[in-house]
Amino acid sequence: MLWYIVAGAGGLLIGYLIANYQINQKLRKAKEDAQTIIEKAEKEANEIKKKAIIEGREEVHRLREEFEKERSRREEELRALEERLLKREELLTRKEENLEKREQQVEELKANLEEKMREVEEKEKRIDEELKRLAGMTVEEARELILEEARQRYEHDLAKLYKEMKEQVEEEAEKEAKKVIAFAVQRYAPDYVGEITVSTVSLPSDDMKGRIIGREGRNIRTFEKITGVDLIIDDTPEVVVLSCFNPLRREIARITLEKLVADGRIHPARIEEMYEKAKQEVEKAIKEAGQEATFKAGVMGLHPELVKLLGKLKYRTSYGQNVLNHSIEVALLAGYMASELGLNADKARRGGLLHDIGKAVDQELEGSHTTIGAELARRYGEKEDIINMILSHHGEEEPMTPEAVLVAAADALSAARPGARRESLENYIKRLMKLEEIAKSFKYVEKAYAIQAGREIRVIVEPDKVDDALAEKLAYDISKKIEEELEYPGVLKVVVIREKRSVAYAK
């Protein structure tokens, strides 16, 4: 009996040990399988990564080949244009030779006329003697009679010849001018996109709209105050709209908002930080835009400050037309026409590119954009003939050179193209600019921003010099001056903002 008990206990012990061993074997196998799966996943991930890198390199190579093809095509077009220009120059040379031949014919006609006059004088002498013999007239009386008859007869012929030649020359000159202008316009036929007063910023999700607004709207108020741009948030999915008549302020605001959305941290301090970074980016973009404009127009050797001012024109519009694109267009048109007429094309392009340079700062300085532009050009070393082109394209001075006339003509061509400018948008922008100018004319005003499509103006004042009572009076005075000097629909809200900041650092 005892032996059975011992045997049963031994069997149980052996069964336990075997079961424990099997469990340990299964655990070890499970760990090995898990390690194998992990290694396999890592291997597949590396293969996917390598494949993505290879595909990326292939895409870069493809894009590079497309770029080289496009560049080759553009170079071929340029060579074709140069060949056409050479042919036009040859045609112009032949026409000049024909004109010289006609001038020679005129000289020959003039010589023949003088010869006939001498023959008339000889006949007059013979007639004098005959009249004196036959009629008993004095020499003076006979001479006066003959001269009067000859004068009446030949003056009529000479006047008729002069009129015919004048009409012929004027007709040919008009035809040639039309050909020159048509050829210049055909050589430069750019695409044009009208400027608008809004920009859109895409959002990763509609949840971001709440973060942009902030607690009780503090973020959106800070953003609009710092940038001077309306931030419009509506039901449009994953999009917000920035509205401002000033393209420069709108671009800075767009970059600021995109940086905030990408960063994800949106609060007043972060808004100010991103705004400063956006301003630096736009300053860099302005410089690059100016350099690109000089390259497109083929103008070299400009002062760096003039290049920077050209870049600012990228963010200015005139009747809905971008001023920088307009300046490049005027430069190229003037250069083409100068080449056709055998004039200085480099000088014409330089004057055309700089003719509206004053518009880069005319909001900051007193005077017309032509006067301001001439002052800037003189300050940065431009020659008097270029300065004359700037002043004469709107008639403030008489053109000193043929190139100045071409710049004025190119300016008119660019502005008069159908669809190039829009009157209503320009009037709206001028009204908003006038609104800001009125607010800035008051003492202690630092900045002024017209927002809400001109229905509200926010005025930021110096906090150390304006208290609450003076702020209320300033708002009243500004509103009264706006009522006197501007016409506007509905009610216009004037908001005076004074903010005092004290900053200290704990070390």
Curated annotation (Swiss-Prot):
Presence of the UniProt keyword Ligase in the record: no
Chief site of localization: membrane
Domain KH: 197-282
Class in the EC hierarchy, top level: hydrolase
PROSITE patterns found in the cross-reference section: HD (PS51831), KH_TYPE_1 (PS50084)
Pfam annotation, one family: HD
Keywords: Cell membrane, Endonuclease, Hydrolase, Membrane, Nuclease, RNA-binding, Transmembrane, Transmembrane helix
One term under GO cellular component: plasma membrane
Limits of the HD domain: 323-416
Topological category with respect to the lipid bilayer: Single-pass membrane protein
UniProt subcellular location: Cell membrane
CDD domains given in the database record: HDc, KH-I_RNaseY
MF term (GO), any: RNA binding
SMART domains linked: HDc (SM00471), KH (SM00322)
Family the entry assigns: Belongs to the RNase Y family.
Job description of the protein: Endoribonuclease that initiates mRNA decay.
Protein name listed in UniProt: Ribonuclease Y
Gene: rny
